Amino acid sequence: MTKIISDRIAVYLLIGGLLFRTIIALGLYPGYDEAYYYVYSHNLDWSYFDHPPIVAISTGFGTWITGLVNQFTIRFGTLLLYTGSLCLLYLTALKLFSLPVARMTLAIAT
């Protein structure tokens, strides 16, 4: 994790992408699938036919933290998971290739 923090360009890309996705999450109304996931998050079980439990956990995380139900809190867990995935993608590209490749990978995925 310190490798990401020491690379300012990577930090700027991560923060910029997170801010952009946050603005989009605040502006768009929930779709049918997100409303379904919200209702689904209140009836947790080990597995369902159509989705694994992580979908319900990531959807219900924001409403559990804040106690509010709106388009941002429904998408909050997904925003965190995607940012974490970008960090892992950057670290993988850095380990396998080089710093410029890791930055380019992060820029493309962001």
Describe the residue ranges of each PLM region.
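Membrane-water interface at transmembrane helix exits
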Residues: 20, 24, 63, 90-98
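Transmembrane helix-loop junction
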Residues: 43, 60, 64, 94-95, ...
